[in-house]
Amino acid sequence: MKVSLPAFEKARVLVVGDVMLDRYWVGPTGRISPEAPVPVVKINQVEDRPGGAANVALNIATLGGQVQLAGLVGQDDTAIALTLGVQTLGVEPQWLSIADKPTITKLRVLSRNQQLIRLDFEEAFDKADSVRLLKQSEALLDSIDVVVLSDYAKGAIDQPRDFIALARSKGVMVLVDPKGSDFGRYHGASLITPNMSEFEAVVGTVTSEADLLEKARGLLKEHHFDAILVTRSEKGMTLVTANAPELHIPTVAREVYDVTGAGDTVISALATSLAAGADLPQACAIANTAAGVVVGKLGTSTVSRIELIEALALHHGESGFGVVSEDQLAYALEQAKLRGERVVMTNGCFDILHAGHVSYLKQAKALGDRLIVAVNDDASVKRLKGEGRPVNQVDRRMAVLAGLASVDWVVPFSEDTPQRIIARLLPDLLVKGGDYKIEDIAGGAEVIAAGGQVQVLGFEDGISTTAIIQNIMANQ
């Protein structure tokens, strides 16, 4: 499947659920305690990270989405730390403070990248607290595209059916990361994302792929879900919908250090992608890739857009050089910019590649780190050059160009001028051969407006494709 990242900055998401603070105490272990057969950890690092539903919100914000976060907190120092933690990263908190309950905290002690123990500080919230939180959240539905219900069974989401129905009636998609053995609580949700253990807790042991699909479709019908995405660890993900064939997406994780927060990453990437306009299969592929990134990190973590671009390029074959599509080239350029590389771009028909072309392209490449050559397709060459042209089809012209040491990427375009593709890619330097005036070069104004440069290079005298063709015809 070809995967393209949508414009995450357009996504407007509300996350409602169990917020918590993930606290990490880290240090070396050098001896066993004389008091009990346990290691002694000398703490030299303390770190607080927003967890649970707050980690979902942070993932959305890190991808570039606009996100509000509704949850239950206590009136304590932990709530203050959690508030600062989410606000610093661009999340807008919408807390309901409960005086007699602590803000949920999970303390993990780590040494040598291994978790030794986890200590939980929490008390279950009352049902009335959940009712108030969901009622408070209803007022936010008119300004968002997607709701995420992040349920950790701590009491923030008790009976959300009415809230789900109201959101759906307003055209808002509702995604649920479920908990417990009763998925009926989420009746009418757009999508639920159980892991395999959560899925089997509801439907019983899954004995085969066919059994999984049958049981998933049974849940769709029973609870009026639009889709179920079952996350399956090393087996990847399986998407089941009512009106389309199932979709199996293999895992892309290379190394697994810590699965903490992987489910949060999946639903946050789904929500951000869908809110930004991606279709469901695309959103699932993006979420699967994001999960593969985050499990390679230690502790509760987020995934950035740049990390997603790099991972998608690696796993979907879109990071290479040579002949590429526009979308593939857009991915590659984001990586090049991340590496601080200067990108040069030129264009032409290059119908019969000759020594003048080779010299010109070497000059162009010398002006930067990477060179893009945009090539007119066959129809546009015919319109520009007339009958009998091109001599070589576009795939052959691009293959020859891609074989030159000076050329990094070759991309086709179908218009008579490259203005549109140049305006999309916006190289650091646009070059053109001949006696053009800079103001007359297609795409030049867009490059300059974006902070780039435009330069005219000379061709070698006496060498041209037209002259070569005429010489061939004269000698026949």
From Swiss-Prot:
InterPro entries (UniProt xref): Bifunc_HldE, Carboh/pur_kinase_PfkB_CS, Cyt_trans-like, PfkB_dom, RfaE_dom_I, RfaE_dom_II, Ribokinase-like, Rossmann-like_a/b/a_fold
Pathway(s): Nucleotide-sugar biosynthesis; ADP-L-glycero-beta-D-manno-heptose biosynthesis; ADP-L-glycero-beta-D-manno-heptose from D-glycero-beta-D-manno-heptose 7-phosphate: step 1/4; Nucleotide-sugar biosynthesis; ADP-L-glycero-beta-D-manno-heptose biosynthesis; ADP-L-glycero-beta-D-manno-heptose from D-glycero-beta-D-manno-heptose 7-phosphate: step 3/4
Chain positions covered by the region annotation Ribokinase: 1-319
Domain of life according to the entry: Bacteria
Keyword Nucleotide-binding applies: yes
E.C. number: 2.7.1.167, 2.7.7.70
Region described as Cytidylyltransferase: spans on this chain: 345-476
Top enzyme class: transferase
Active site: 264
GO terms, molecular function: ATP binding; heptose 7-phosphate kinase activity; heptose-1-phosphate adenylyltransferase activity; phosphotransferase activity, alcohol group as acceptor
Residues the record lists as binding ATP: 195-198
Catalytic activity as recorded in UniProt: D-glycero-beta-D-manno-heptose 7-phosphate + ATP = D-glycero-beta-D-manno-heptose 1,7-bisphosphate + ADP + H(+); D-glycero-beta-D-manno-heptose 1-phosphate + ATP + H(+) = ADP-D-glycero-beta-D-manno-heptose + diphosphate
GO cellular component, one term: cytosol
Alphabetical list of PROSITE patterns matching this protein: PFKB_KINASES_1 (PS00583), PFKB_KINASES_2 (PS00584)
Any single GO BP term: ADP-L-glycero-beta-D-manno-heptose biosynthetic process
Keyword Metal-binding tagged: no
Entry keyword set: ATP-binding, Carbohydrate metabolism, Kinase, Multifunctional enzyme, Nucleotide-binding, Nucleotidyltransferase, Transferase
PANTHER family according to UniProt: BIFUNCTIONAL PROTEIN HLDE
Quaternary structure and interacting proteins, as annotated: Homodimer.
Similarity remark: In the N-terminal section; belongs to the carbohydrate kinase PfkB family. In the C-terminal section; belongs to the cytidylyltransferase family.
Role: Catalyzes the ADP transfer from ATP to D-glycero-beta-D-manno-heptose 1-phosphate, yielding ADP-D-glycero-beta-D-manno-heptose.
Protein name: Bifunctional protein HldE
Source organism per UniProt: Shewanella sp. (strain W3-18-1)
Lineage, uppermost ranks: Bacteria, Pseudomonadati, Pseudomonadota, Gammaproteobacteria, Alteromonadales
Gene name of this polypeptide: hldE
